[in-house]
Amino acid sequence: MDSQGRKVIVVDNGTGFVKCGYAGTNFPAHIFPSMVGRPIVRSTQRVGNIEIKDLMVGEECSQLRQMLDINYPMDNGIVRNWDDMAHVWDHTFGPEKLDIDPKECKLLLTEPPLNPNSNREKMFQVMFEQYGFNSIYVAVQAVLTLYAQGLLTGVVVDSGDGVTHICPVYEGFALHHLTRRLDIAGRDITKYLIKLLLQRGYNFNHSADFETVRQMKEKLCYIAYDVEQEERLALETTVLSQQYTLPDGRVIRLGGERFEAPEILFQPHLINVEKAGLSELLFGCIQASDIDTRLDFYKHIVLSGGTTMYPGLPSRLEKELKQLYLDRVLHGNTDAFQKFKIRIEAPPSRKHMVFLGGAVLANLMKDRDQDFWVSKKEYEEGGIARCMAKLGIKA
């Protein structure tokens, strides 16, 4: 709470999951799927202890996904369906989760780098006009990730469910002109794994199966350090073969699919996306920065988001970055290469790094009403332009 007794709330709206809680805490109070479902056929009132309602949000929606028409309000990190997003926020602030009176609360929201102005403006409008929050602050996710690591300068590689961003931050400011975006993330890896399993004769094309394959992916997939070697192992041996028990009791075996699915992060052409992979984008991003900041950036690369949790990802990224630097900057000069230092930080809590940074920042700033929080009064008097100006954003 701030000095006036108002609760300070932090909400990290991800494409796949909402993480919400309070300033000063080191873990979200609630994590739930950012999905909305409506019954396909109203044939029954209850399933187990869950009542089937006309509108289901979050965990209940995920558990009953076989019976529902599922909609994800966010896509690639950006809100596409505001009506359904409002249902997700009703769930967040209502008795099911935080159970707050917005008029007595300050709210810190997170946004992806390169968030369109129209998206941010609509978010302010909804939070002030529909919910009536006392005051609001919007922070860029990459900056919050660095705060959670105790850093002000570094490059954040943030890959969640809907989008991957590489965002350099200098002295606490996100450098948007250098930010790289890749529209490949967790959801695309799940879709590609479904396709690979289909080629093996396993059919997972129902929307309900999507969650099953997502859980399978999180349990079994990894990033190959050496793709050719893994391909040989998959072809010639059964070393990579692991079994997975489906919810209905059937058992399936996964082999090469375990590394082939997440490989699209490094080789987007596998799913017909003509973009550079993760290592190329990261290298290009750092090399495009000021020559004085490059060494700092190479020494402070921070991974964030659930899709960076794959075993093997930090070492593969480091290997490819070093190779790119040796080939393109040093032109094969191995003596100079000995002095090149690179450090990739992969904190164990990186799935929730954005929330943690938000909780730290909101706690530090909870009483800085004049120069930090945008109040409802300021919004009503000066409109969206005043809000953007206070946040230091050109409207």
From Swiss-Prot:
Disruption phenotype: RNAi-mediated knockdown suppresses the memory retention defects of the msi-1 os1 loss of function mutant. GO terms for cellular component: Arp2/3 protein complex; cell cortex. It comes from the Eukaryota. The keyword GTP-binding does not apply. InterPro entries: Actin, Actin/actin-like_CS, Actin_CS, ATPase_NBD. This is Actin-related protein 2. CDD domains: ASKHA_NBD_Arp2 (cd10220). It is found in: Cytoplasm, Cytoskeleton. Functions as ATP-binding component of the Arp2/3 complex which is involved in regulation of actin polymerization and together with an activating nucleation-promoting factor (NPF) mediates the formation of branched actin networks. Seems to contact the pointed end of the daughter actin filament. Plays a role in time-dependent memory loss and the retention of conditioned behavior over time. Component of the Arp2/3 complex, at least composed of arx-1, arx-2, arx-4 and arx-6. Transmembrane segments: none annotated. The keyword Nucleotide-binding applies. Pfam families: Actin. PROSITE patterns: ACTINS_2, ACTINS_ACT_LIKE. Belongs to the actin family. ARP2 subfamily. Keywords: Actin-binding, ATP-binding, Cytoplasm, Cytoskeleton, Nucleotide-binding. Gene3D superfamilies: 3.30.420.40, Actin, Chain A, domain 4.
